[in-house]
């Protein structure tokens, strides 16, 4: 058994940069056809498609801030490759400024929840509908229940979703909600052979964290909280995401996969 995704179609959100781009590359290398979205980084998205090959990879411009936008993206993935086997909800925003709860505007809160949570609801809703439709088609053709999962969903949360984050309660709440969704949906969708898991990264070297990590005092403080003494790479997060979508993880559902250098252990 290999880490192979031959004949599988994956939708990876936030795929033009960071963890998402690393996941797109790994999934294509594993044999999957991949559709990913980008918000405004068209040049990076086009470059990634050229790197992976247009026959294997498609980019869709889509700002994921509502369930309606999510429905459009799922439809685009199915239109591109005819089916959908894997959803990786990787997109999200982390407002970098420290904001006390009594100073946080309604707009600030609602924007984070819209992007990090509401759009994920839409992605899951429409992806599951497509996966169930495919399962019925397989059952009708074979006359029995498929012996292997018909769908895989991986949500990308955060250590903040497990232990909170002062002055970023909007972000922590949105990521904590994803963990609760995984716990509920993994049981709900098991009967449909759809596995649902979560990867919870800690600090990762991406453009989202670049400014914070460029500040020496902040960098030293961050490193001191991580037993492995460094931040993760995007590939070190994308690897576990890939694993959870392969046959090696066929008996895993409802799990919160911590990928943070041990930070949660000492947080």
Role assignments for model-derived ranges:
Residues 30-47:
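Conserved glycine-rich Rossmann-like NAD(P)H-binding loop of the short-chain dehydrogenase/reductase
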Residues 97-101, 105-113, 222:
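Substrate-binding pocket helix/loop in short-chain dehydrogenase/reductase
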Residues 16-17:
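Conserved glycine-rich cofactor-binding loop
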Residues 158:
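Residue(s) in the substrate-gating loop at a strand-loop-helix junction
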Residues 124, 174, 182:
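Active-site helix of classical SDR
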Residues 98, 163, 241-242, 253-267:
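Short C-terminal tail/terminal secondary-structure segment
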Residues 129, 187-191, 250:
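Alpha-helical segment proximal to the catalytic Tyr-Lys
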């Amino acid at each position: 058994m290999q880490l192979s995704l031959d004949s599988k179609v994956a939708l990876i959100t936030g795929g033009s940069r960071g963890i998402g781009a690393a996941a797109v590359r790994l999934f294509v290398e594993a044999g999957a056809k991949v559709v990913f979205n980008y918000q405004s980084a068209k040049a990076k998205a086009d470059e990634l498609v050229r790197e992976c090959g247009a026959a294997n990879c498609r980019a869709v411009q889509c700002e994921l801030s509502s369930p309606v936008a999510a429905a459009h993206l799922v439809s685009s993935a199915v239109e591109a490759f005819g089916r959908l086997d894997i959803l990786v909800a990787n997109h999200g925003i982390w407002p970098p400024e420290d904001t006390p709860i009594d100073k946080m505007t309604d707009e600030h809160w609602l924007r984070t929840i819209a992007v990090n949570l509401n759009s994920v609801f839409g992605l899951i809703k429409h992806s599951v509908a497509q996966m169930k439709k495919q399962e019925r088609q397989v059952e009708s053709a074979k006359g029995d229940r498929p012996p292997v999962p018909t769908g895989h969903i991986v949500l990308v949360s955060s250590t903040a979703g497990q232990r909170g984050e002062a002055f970023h309660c909007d972000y922590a709440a949105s990521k904590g909600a994803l963990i609760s969704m995984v716990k509920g949906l993994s049981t709900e969708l098991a009967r449909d052979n759809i596995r649902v898991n979560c990867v919870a990264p800690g600090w990762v070297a991406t453009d989202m964290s670049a400014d914070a990590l460029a500040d020496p005092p902040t960098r030293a403080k961050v490193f001191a909280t991580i037993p492995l003494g460094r931040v993760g790479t995007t590939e070190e997060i994308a690897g576990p995401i890939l694993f959870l979508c392969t046959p090696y993880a066929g008996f895993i559902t409802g799990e919160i996969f911590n990928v943070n250098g041990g930070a949660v252990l000492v947080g």
